[in-house]
Design a protein with these regions (language model features):
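A short, flexible loop at the N-terminus of ABC-type nucleotide-binding domains that lies
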Residues: 4-15, 21-35, 84-85
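Conserved ABC transporter NBD signature motif
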Residues: 72-80, 87-88
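Walker A (P-loop) phosphate-binding loop of ABC-type ATPase nucleotide-binding domains
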Residues: 51-55
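Conserved catalytic motifs of ABC-family nucleotide-binding domains
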Residues: 166
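Catalytic Walker B motif of ABC-type/P-loop ATPase nucleotide-binding domains
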Residues: 170-173
């Protein structure tokens, strides 16, 4: 275990009763977050999931001390967020979903600018900037102005900037938004590396379910500003009793009413000669289900494990 890992406190985030409201131009108050309480271990990659408008970005903004809540207590890396904002900011960083940098500066100039804000100078600054440009494949674009970059390149620049101060805790808001598949994969590999090898705590929001399942040790699912589920991806799937999916492609007629009453069947949907049946015992249920397709010709059968996207759909209802 590295010295950096040993230095990290047991909890990266401790939140209790966090509430946030915004006022509209008409003076009306809208509640964005309601009574958010959770502890995030420094040893984990923690995911925030939920539909648009559920409060994920607002919560990350509060955790990263960009804004304050109206109510509740918050501790970051063992420090009270109210009285230690400067000390906390020296230990954390953030990559936003919609990066915004000085438009007239080049990639390299932007990284040097932020590096100096983080206290880097001389050879250390040059080396760190070069390392991050190489890590996020920005070297060939180092002389390109920010205003000329694609969405994906802007996102990669934001990630590179977030690593300049060697943070103990990093907040990632939709870290792979706008990235090509190969760069998305490399970004996920980098997130895993900086957590596993450098001992950096990671709190991230994402809409990409396979990404959350691949990276996150635990997940909080937000809906209408409240946490409606908090657990590991595996336990979320188990507790919601989503079951396995038997997917059958067929020609002809199937006895749908009999299928709905079949023991072990949790639900089904049929469309254009393909039926997806949720069951609590996949292979054990298969023989009884196939018998109810006696009047049809089955052309394909597939048994699928439930994934985090199934959890997302179930919790978002």
């Amino acid at each position: 275990m590295s010295d950096k890992v040993m230095q990290i406190t047991e909890k990266s985030v401790q939140a209790k009763g966090i509430c946030k409201r915004y006022k509209s131009f008409f003076g009306r108050s809208a509640t964005i977050l309601k009574d958010i309480s959770l502890d995030i271990d420094a040893s984990e990659i923690f995911g925030l999931l939920g539909p648009n408008g559920s409060g994920k970005t607002t919560l990350i903004s509060i955790f990263s001390t960009l804004i304050y809540p109206e109510a509740g207590s918050l501790s970051i890396l063992g420090m009270d967020a109210r009285g230690n904002r400067d000390a906390i900011r020296r230990c954390i960083n953030i990559s936003t979903a919609k990066p915004n940098f000085p438009w007239s500066l080049t990639v390299k100039e932007n990284l040097r600018h932020y590096g100096m804000l983080y206290g880097l100078y001389g050879a250390a600054l040059s080396r760190t900037v070069q390392d991050q440009m190489e890590a996020f494949e920005l070297s060939e674009f180092q002389d390109h102005k920010f205003e000329d970059l694609s969405t994906g390149l802007k996102q990669r620049l934001s990630l590179a900037k977030a690593m300049l101060n060697h943070p103990r805790l990093i907040f990632l808001d939709e870290p792979t938004t706008g990235l090509d598949p190969d760069i998305s994969l490399k970004t996920r590999q980098l997130i895993r590396r900086i957590h596993d090898e450098d001992g950096i705590s990671v709190v991230m929001s994402t809409h990409y379910m396979p990404e959350a399942e691949m990276l996150c040790d635990r997940i909080a699912f937000l809906r209408h500003g409240s946490i409606v589920a908090l657990d590991t991806p595996q336990n979320l799937k188990r507790h919601l009793k989503l079951g396995e999916r038997i997917c059958i492609t067929y020609q002809g007629e199937a006895d749908i009413s009999a299928l709905q009453g079949q023991p072990g069947v949790l639900g089904l949907k049929a469309e254009n000669g393909r039926m997806e049946i949720a069951v609590d015992r996949g292979e054990e249920s298969l023989d009884g289900i196939i018998k109810l397709f006696s009047g049809a010709k089955i052309t394909d059968i597939e048994i699928k494990e439930p994934d985090l996207e199934d959890v997302f759909i179930e919790l978002a209802r």
